[in-house]
Amino acid sequence: MSKFFERDDDIVALATPFLSSALCVIRSSGASSISKFSKIFSNHSALNSASGNTIHYGYILDSENGCKVDEVVVCLYRAPKSFTGQDAIEVMAHGSVIGIKKIIDLFLKSGFRMAEPGEFTLRAFLAKKIDLTKAEAIHEIIFAKTNKTYSLAVNKLSGALFVKIDAIKKSILNFLSAVSVYLDYEVDDHEISIPFDLILSSKAELKKLINSYKVYEKIDNGVALVLAGSVNAGKSSLFNLFLKKDRSIVSSYPGTTRDYIEASFELDGILFNLFDTAGLRDADNFVERLGIEKSNSLIKEASLVIYVIDVSSNLTKDDFLFIDSNKSNSKILFVLNKIDLKINKSTEEFVRSKVLNSSNLIMISTKNLEGIDILYDKIRALISYERVEIGLDDIIISSNRQMQLLEKAYALILDLLSKIDRQVSYDMLAFDAYEIINCLGEITGEVSSEDVLDNMFKNFCLGK
C-alpha cells in the first residue's frame, strides 16, 4: 500500500496559495497532530487539554531557540468531529512567504510529513466523512469557471448526486432481491412478483444522467468567440471592453497584435473563450505569417466570429475578400467600429450592400461605448443555441470517471433488458443486476480500488 493510503502518520500542508497575502492557512491532520503541534505553540498546555472545535490565540515558537516566529490563531478539532475524521490543527498565520516556510519547516521538524495533493480529502473519504461524489464536488468547486458550474458543484456537495445514484441502486437491488427469492426458494413465477418495471425506470434515470454530461461539457468548455479584422480596426479595444480590463495593447500603430491573445469572460452564465487575433493582411515576415495563419484557423473553428471594420477608413483588400467570402455566414457578426469619428460613407455602404442579413451588422464605438449594448444583445441571440437552461437544483454529471461508469451501467441494463425479453435463466439476470449495483457503487465509492482512488485524489490541489 502506498504512502498515500497510510493514515497513521501526521500530515501538514499549506491550504492557501504560496503568495504574499494578509493571511494564510496551514492545515494538519493525524492521531498525534495536536500533541506534536503543541511543542511549537506558545500556549501548549491549554492546547493539549482543549476540547474539539475550539480556537486558540498564541505564537509559533522556534523549537530550537524559543524565539517567536509568528502570531497565529489556531483552530483545534478532535476526532471524529473534523473534516478528515482525525485530530486536526488549522493555523491561521500572516501570509508572509518567509513566515510560511518557517512554520512548515517547524511542523516537519516536529514529526509531520508533507501531505500529498488531495490527501486530506482522501482521509475524509476513507473515514466515511464524505463519499466520492462529494470529494469530486470539492474539486469542482475549487476549479469552477463560471457561477453556473460553481452552483452545480455546491448542489452535489450537499449530497444530491449520491441520493440519485443510491435511489437507482436501490431499485436494482429490489429487483435482485426478488430474483434471489425465486432462485433460493424455487418458487413458481406466479408466486412472486418480479419488479421488471424497476429496470426500465432505472434505465431512464441513467440516460438522464448520461445526457447531463453533454450539457455540462457545453457549459464548462464555453463558446469560442474570435475577434477578427484588418489591422488597427479596434479588435484589441473591443477585446479589453469584453474583459472590462486591459489585456491587449491598444495603440494607433497598425499591427500591434502579432499572434493572438486569449482570455475568458462570462455573459448570462455562459463562458466565452475570447481570442484577439492578429490583423488580417499580407505579412512581411515569417513570424507574422504564422500569426495570421493561426488567426484564420481560429476563425474556422470558432462558434462565433466578430469581424471588426474601421468605418472611418477605406476598406483594405483583406476586408473586401473576407466580406465577399462570408457575407452569408450566420456565425459571423460584422461590426463597424469608430462611429465616433467621421464615417467613411463608401465603406459603410459597401458593407451594407454585401452582408445579406442586415441584423448581423452592428455599428459601434469602443471609445464612447455607443452601440455596445446592441452588440451584447446580438451576441446573446447568435449563441442562443449554446444556452442551456439548468436549474441550480438539477443534478449534472461533470466527471469523466462518473460518466464512464454510468455508460457501463447503462450498457449492462440494456443487456439485462435483452435477457429479460429472451427469457433467459434467472441466475443470469441476478448476475447482471449484481454487476450494475457494483458499477453504481464505484461512482459513490462504496466499491473502489486503490488505483482508482490514487489517480483521482492526486489531481486535487495541495492542502485539500
From Swiss-Prot:
Q: What is its EC number?
A: 3.6.-.-
Q: Kindly give the InterPro entries that the UniProt entry links to this protein.
A: G_TrmE, GTP-bd, GTP-bd_TrmE_N, GTPase_MnmE, MnmE_dom2, MnmE_helical, P-loop_NTPase, Small_GTP-bd
Specify which residues bind GTP according to the UniProt entry for this protein.
Answer: 232-237, 251-257, 276-279
Please indicate if the UniProt record lists Cell division as a keyword: no
Q: One MF term in GO for this entry?
A: metal ion binding
One Pfam family it belongs to: MnmE_helical
- Where's it found, cell-wise? Cytoplasm
Binding-site residues, K(+): S251
Provide the binding site for (6S)-5-formyl-5,6,7,8-tetrahydrofolate: R27, E90, K129, K464
Q: Which cofactor does it need?
A: K(+)
Listed GO biological process terms? tRNA methylation; tRNA wobble uridine modification
Sequence positions that bind Mg(2+):
S236, T257
Keywords per UniProt:
Cytoplasm, GTP-binding, Hydrolase, Magnesium, Metal-binding, Nucleotide-binding, Potassium, tRNA processing
**TM segment ranges:** none
One GO term of the cellular component aspect? cytosol
Where does the TrmE-type G domain start and stop, copy by copy? 222-384
Superkingdom to which the source organism belongs: Bacteria
PROSITE patterns, A to Z: G_TRME (PS51709)
Q: How is the cofactor bound?
A: Binds 1 potassium ion per subunit.
Entries under NCBIfam families matching the protein: mnmE_trmE_thdF, small_GTP
Provide the assembly information: Homodimer. Heterotetramer of two MnmE and two MnmG subunits.
Summary of the function given for this chain in its UniProt record = Exhibits a very high intrinsic GTPase hydrolysis rate. Involved in the addition of a carboxymethylaminomethyl (cmnm) group at the wobble position (U34) of certain tRNAs, forming tRNA-cmnm(5)s(2)U34.
User: Which protein family is it in?
Assistant: Belongs to the TRAFAC class TrmE-Era-EngA-EngB-Septin-like GTPase superfamily. TrmE GTPase family.
Protein name per Swiss-Prot or TrEMBL? tRNA modification GTPase MnmE
